[in-house]
Amino acid sequence: MAILQNSRQSHKQLPIISQTIRSAWCQQRPINAMHQDVRQKSIGSGNETKLEAKETEVPTNRRRRRRRCSSSSTSDSSASSYSSTDSDSGSSTSSSSIRSQLPALNLPVPLPLATPTPPAVSSPHQAPSPRRNSSDSNRSVSPVEVPVDPHAWTPEDIASWVRWATRKFKLDPEPDIDRFPKDAQELCDLSRADFWVCAGSRRGGMLLAQHFAISLYHATGRETSPMLNDDEPNPYQLLNAASHRLVAQGSGGQIQLWQFLLELLADSSNANAISWEGQSGEFRLIDPDEVARRWGERKAKPNMNYDKLSRALRYYYDKNIMTKVHGKRYAYKFDFHGLMAACQAQAQGGDPASSMLGSYNHHAGGAMQLGRHPPPLHHHPQHSHPHHQLGQPHFLHPHHSSPASNSSSLGFPSSSTASSQASPGQAPASSSASTSNFTAPFQGGTAGVDPARTSTSSAGNYDQGPVTPTTNAFN
């Protein structure tokens, strides 16, 4: 009975329970619907803001460290934004402030990249370069003082003059000082062709010959016009000048066949065996067997004959040193340009014993002294002029054919300009040496006479400086 009563009570309570469940179910549906509709506004906004704050917490800490390194103000603002993330309104404000500061956070990153290379840093490196170049150029044309009279030059003066002219006129290739004579008298005896051979180039020989002729003129008052013109010496003169150097060089050491032939041609006593034909570099073996015998003696080859000698000569055809003259027996012709190239190559090879451009002791008879061919006119120091005193000022006028010009191509006055100034013959005689101060002789311009010239000291001052030095100053 008790069981039945309990079952009845449970049946009675079922509608009540179902009603309770039904009412509870009906009350939660609008709550769920409201939750779904207003999730982002009321219930979910705080949670989402907190999630966003947590997500931005890590990069905020990183940015805070960067801002802390850069400036204290930025670190304070990052700390305040971090503390305001506890509330919904504070989190939205901090997130907006962070977004507004994001562009500013990127600004310090490129700035340090540009600061190490300011424009002022490169200027100190660029400024010294022109000063270095100017100092090098000043050193390259530093003044050189030598005696007024080239006849009084020492070997050191000759070397200083060659070095100065090389730098001043930018001679290329640079002349070898050892090619020039060490004696002043021998240097004064050089012809224009000798200067070509000493310089080793056309331009170098022309400029050195012209400048030295000017120095001789200012010392002696005598013009050396053949050394001042721009006409090239004929091949005979050049080859003959080179052959005289080989004679002065001596017979020791290794020597090439073409050098040996030039040695024989330089001595007129060998005319019965070999001689020049004309003045174009052509020569003829008068006695080819005698020439071959002498060549065998020089090379210590007693079996030498003309057949072997001619085969050796054919080797020079491809080198453009010499050629065979067709239609003439035992006749050959030197090619000066190929010969000079061979001389320069041999000199650069460091074999002074076999180089015709090696150490020079001028031939006692002077350059171009052959019996059948007179040498070109050049200055002879033994020819004196009583009205010219050494060291007196003279103005060179090498181009008499152009009186309208006030300055020659070398930078000195022409005859019309010189005639209006003090004449060499009118200059007072002086027993003491005077000076001539040359300032860049080849740079052009007219020369002036220093009015402060006295009877005891006369000077041709080209920069109107003091008249006290006793030397030529090549600037």
Curated annotation (Swiss-Prot):
Residues 375-388 have a biased composition (Basic residues). One of its GO terms (biological process) is regulation of transcription by RNA polymerase II. It is found in: Nucleus. One of its GO terms (cellular component) is nucleus. InterPro entries: Ets_dom, ETS_fam, Pointed_dom, SAM/pointed_sf, WH-like_DNA-bd_sf, WH_DNA-bd_sf. Its main location: nucleus. Residues 42-150, 350-475 are annotated as: Disordered. Embryonic ventral nervous system and 1 pair of neurons in each thoracic segment. Pfam families: Ets, SAM_PNT. It comes from the Eukaryota. PROSITE patterns: ETS_DOMAIN_1 (PS00345), ETS_DOMAIN_2 (PS00346), ETS_DOMAIN_3 (PS50061), PNT (PS51433). Residues 132-219 form the PNT domain. SMART domains: ETS, SAM_PNT. Residues 255-335 bind DNA. One of its GO terms (molecular function) is sequence-specific DNA binding. Keywords: DNA-binding, Nucleus. Residues 453-475 have a biased composition (Polar residues). The keyword Nucleus applies. Residues 70-108, 122-144, 401-436 have a biased composition (Low complexity). The keyword DNA-binding applies. PANTHER family: DNA-BINDING PROTEIN D-ETS-6, ETS. Belongs to the ETS family. This is DNA-binding protein D-ETS-6. It comes from Drosophila melanogaster.
